[in-house]
Amino acid sequence: MNEKIEVFGARVHNLKNIDITIPRNSLTVFTGLSGSGKSSLAFDTIFAEGQRRYIETFSAYARNFLGNMERPDVDKITGLSPVISIEQKTTNKNPRSTVGTTTEIYDYLRLLYARAGEAFSYMSGEKMVKYTEEKVVDMIMADYRERKIYILAPLVRNRKGHYRELFEQMRRKGYLYIRIDGEIEELTRGMKVDRYKNHNIEVVIDKMKLSDTEDATQRERLSKTIATAMKQGDGLIMILDNETSAAKYFSKRLMDPVTGIAYKDPAPNIFSFNSPEGACPHCKGLGIIDEIDLKKVIPDDALNIYEGAIVPLGKYKNQMIFWQIEALLKKYDCTLKTPVKDIPKECMDEILYGSLEKLKIAKELVHTSSDYFISFDGIIKYLRTIMESDDSAAGKKWADQFIAEVTCPECHGQRLNREALSYKIWDKNIAELANMDISELKDWIDHVEEHMTEKQRVIATEIVKEIRKRINFLLEVGLDYLALNRQSATLSGGESQRIRLATQIGSQLVNVLYILDEPSIGLHQRDNERLIKSLKELRDMGNTVIVVEHDEDMMRAADWIVDIGPKAGRKGGEVVFQGKPADMLKKHTLTAQYLNGERKIEIPTERRKGNGKSIKLIGCTGNNLKGVDVTFPLGELIVVTGVSGSGKSTLINETLQPILSQHFYRSLKRPMPYKKIEGIDNIDKVVNVDQSPIGRTPRSNPATYTGVFSDIRQLFVNLPEAKIRGYKPGRFSFNVRGGRCEACGGNGYKTIEMNFLPDVMVPCEICHGKRYNRETLEVRFKGKSIADVLDMTVNMAVEFFENVPQILPKIKALQDVGLGYIKLGQSSTTLSGGESQRVKLATELSKRDTGKTLFILDEPTTGLHFEDIRILMDVLEKLVDRGNTVLIIEHNLDVIKLADYIIDMGPEGGRNGGRLLAAGLPEVVAKNKESHTAPFLAKILK
């Protein structure tokens, strides 16, 4: 077997025909500037080739369903093992996917409850019992000695209906008596009951008087009767004492001896909220339901209906629905111009929920010979009809703005039906376990066997061992604060990646090549060592681990480092170093200079004092926040710190930002609960600069996103040649007909379908990839066509447009954020998260600001090298120097040490977090005894 993996002649994206060697069974780190080609080498070359080779083993028919598997542009790769990629971008958005289902811990818990759980009645709380037919006969003969009894089979339990067919069916089977709602009656032809009432119905199978001694004949008769009753009653029978009329239930299934309710035999799917057997029938296992929010339907009750108080209807229009409401209002001596707050509640209820009586619409309005009478279903039903209709996606989207998600009133958010929630082990049902933090669950699992019977222990031992193993893997990757019922869609990229990492460690595979994309994202320095230990564990099992990473601890812990550079984009794509970390420290690459201390991000000599104004957020209680009161001083660089799960994102992204977005932009996103906010008028806008893509189609690019492309097109329109030809700005767009190449639709390439082979993209033979037709390309500025301009890097464009004041600032802003290497027309789908974020920052930088803007950034250092961080922080410092406020959620100490003000959350993650531990200057926070950030900060500030 090869002792190394070798890549020869890699040319994907900006890679310059590079060769690299990776030792087998090693922890290898790929590092380098953002845009240098690390991901191109790791994911687009090594992973893509590994996946392609695996899929080539499938039949041509199977390959047809697996989509595009192009061969990467590489000469050859030797020694390649099966490859598993663990990226950040593949978060599961399905609301039914949770931490428990992803890690399979919940599946093992379902098995544990199905095999070792004890059932209790949801009606009486009694422990459920289960008997064999022989045991039932013994109990009846012992309990009812010398008594006259009826043996009945329950048919209907508390349900509505006339049951005519059921009675006829029983009569034909030869039964003579039936018990309806406690009264025994003779079965007659055509018998029925009130269909609108709930009924309890039992058929009388037999009646007998038991002797006071053991009678073999009587026992045989009773046994046959019990067997018949069990069959007729679906495993449940009822014994009625003739003297006292007291009823007692017996069942072959789990049964409540008091009320007679019976459960099916437990199976794992009864405890699954994704199965009809276990899901809460009201919310279908989601734990939440959509309700129409009246505050969104009528946000301002001081307005009247004519002016548009009912938002779904808008202002008055000459339409039937307004005529109906007018007729309703007339009954209560009101008009369309009466303020909503002055309309009687009974009238508003009819407007919202409908009226039973027919409303009279004047014949003049409907142009008929007589008055028109019509019923009115109400605004709520109107909205529900649109919501539940499959006809119009746009209509559904419109109705969504009036919807609020509320906890299901039936299961109280626990997702399961009441039967599933009635099974317990050590006084806990399965939903209570799913609601625990992983660290709490570990404690429960470690002690649960002490509280089991011998039989339960024998059944549970292996299951508990598997659960414990998986919990330990999650703890190792620093996810102790998550609960099993946490939705996968709410996890950050780093969290979902570490969950998949824990799952992979649990799978115990060997001889596999794992490729991870920055697993340290969102991880506090405290948890970094646990993550590195997990990766080494994966390596020691006999696997090769490649990590694309910028974290200093990870680099120093690696067995092998590959440094890609020297710069980014066209100036990157080369191997500037490959070897052991100790050897790298002796080199002079950009990465080595930061590792050996030749270069560093300097700590400021003095910190800003701000402008004296602030925003105060009081009483935040979303997720795990414990009534947090926090002050954000304006005109400063504020950094929010704390371990993973301590409440940073809840405080900023889920509370502060939605409040401000609602205030400034009427955003529909609702903030998490809080009491009040003060000082909102001290800023004039809020800008959230995240790492989501700037566009999801190949037609989107940095030039279109920043708006500079409109200015460039206008420049070309004003050229003499364009004026002579009468060209308008649309002529220079590749998205509309006129100037674009129609052969390829302005894409610059054509997609050739190859049926059983992957689709092939070839440059358009008419425009040769330039996107425009010949006539458009004949218009030139300084000898360059519009296609040539799009093909320029930002650095080239800055020189080219240096004398064009309306274009230069927008391009210069891209250069200032360190994106000089990307092309103006580069497809946004090829940009990394860090690059997308900096394009957004550049767009904001190029705008004129009032110096009263609040910028919010969540972990902006994701995907950034030390040098990229230095450039990014220079840009953010400039924004603050202009009077703006920059608020960053961050774990990176190079950013934290530059803060003017730190807000530290903690002390732990999940339930043990959610408190404000410290706020103030970095030097002050570094002395806090409770904070996990403090010791690391103190070390770097020395």
Residue ranges and their predicted role:
Residues 1-942:
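Conserved phosphate-binding elements of NTP-dependent enzyme cores
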